[in-house]
């Protein structure tokens, strides 16, 4: 048992190094799934990934699902992800096409025809004019479940911050940062928990950005140099994780750091430490240890002596 499984994206060449650092999950990057590589690459990823990690995820290529060519690219990527041993396929929904709910439900049906054991995990909208508010994700996930498609929301936290707090339209990161307090995050986590039957799938990188014309331009930045603020987010994550582990109905939680390649391991370990430090007092509280009943009372009195 562990509070959460943590890791980042890795090519085959860095799987061993990532495992030695203590990470427990790995994600196949989009570049691997968008290129034709020797079959031995995929087989080796599956073999080493299975030895070193508890779960393998895949991040789909940045192909537009609104075009036939883009859809075919995703179907090919799912085949490659399957060869790599991936259990979860994370992907972007992309721009609105009209009748989006039904359109993306049909896309998921085609995904499932390739691999109906894969868990599909659509991300929230990443820019202006894209499909994927939290309301829309809820509708899509409920509809897909009715078709017996395995699906969970991909909680890319900075996208939720930008989209749900209107940054794409207002271009005011500081105003949004003031609203993104612990309670705001917890409401989102608990809401998404209700539709995440298998796993809670968190993803995160800080970003900066600005609106220009009809588009919001953003880029990832090192931890501590962007938005959303880390302090309330990590406090909310620690609270959710401890509640999930100690209040019954334990659910597996994955956390994927999606930051810049050159700092991703350092940032991931810093972020992991922040969350775990905030979790210590919550885990060691008497409320969290109430399950031990009279035994806890005896041990407490002995410790006080």
Swiss-Prot record:
It comes from the Archaea. This is Uncharacterized protein MJ1455. The lineage of its organism: Archaea, Methanobacteriati, Methanobacteriota, Methanomada group, Methanococci. InterPro entries: Xyl_isomerase-like_sf. It comes from Methanocaldococcus jannaschii (strain ATCC 43067 / DSM 2661 / JAL-1 / JCM 10045 / NBRC 100440).
């Amino acid at each position: 048992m562990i509070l959460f499984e943590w890791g980042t994206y890795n090519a085959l060449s860095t799987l061993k190094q990532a495992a030695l650092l203590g990470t427990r999950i790995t994600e196949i990057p989009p570049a691997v799934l968008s290129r034709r590589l020797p079959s031995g690459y995929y087989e080796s990823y599956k073999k080493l990934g299975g030895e070193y990690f508890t779960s393998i995820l895949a991040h789909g290529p940045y192909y537009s699902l609104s075009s036939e060519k883009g859809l075919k690219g995703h179907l090919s990527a799912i085949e490659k992800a399957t060869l790599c041993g991936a259990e979860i396929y994370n992907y972007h929904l992309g721009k609105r096409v009209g009748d989006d709910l039904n359109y993306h439900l049909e896309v998921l049906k085609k995904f499932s025809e390739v691999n109906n054991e894969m868990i599909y995990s659509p991300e929230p909208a990443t820019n202006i004019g894209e499909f994927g508010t939290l309301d829309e994700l809820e509708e899509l996930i409920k509809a897909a479940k009715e078709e017996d498609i395995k699906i969970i929301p991909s909680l890319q936290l900075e996208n939720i911050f930008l989209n749900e707090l209107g940054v794409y339209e207002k271009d005011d990161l500081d105003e949004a940062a003031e609203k993104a307090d612990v309670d705001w995050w917890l409401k989102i986590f608990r809401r998404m928990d209700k539709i995440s039957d298998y796993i809670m799938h968190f993803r995160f990188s800080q970003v900066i950005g600005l609106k220009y014309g009809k588009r919001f331009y953003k880029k990832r930045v090192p931890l501590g140099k962007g938005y959303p603020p880390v302090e309330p987010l990590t406090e909310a994550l620690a609270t959710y994780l401890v509640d999930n582990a100690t209040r019954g109905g334990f659910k597996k939680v994955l956390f994927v750091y999606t930051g810049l390649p050159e700092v991703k391991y350092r940032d991931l370990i810093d972020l992991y430490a922040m969350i775990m430090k905030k979790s210590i007092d919550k885990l060691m509280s008497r409320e969290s240890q109430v399950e031990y009943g009279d035994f806890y009372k005896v041990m407490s009195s002995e410790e006080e002596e």
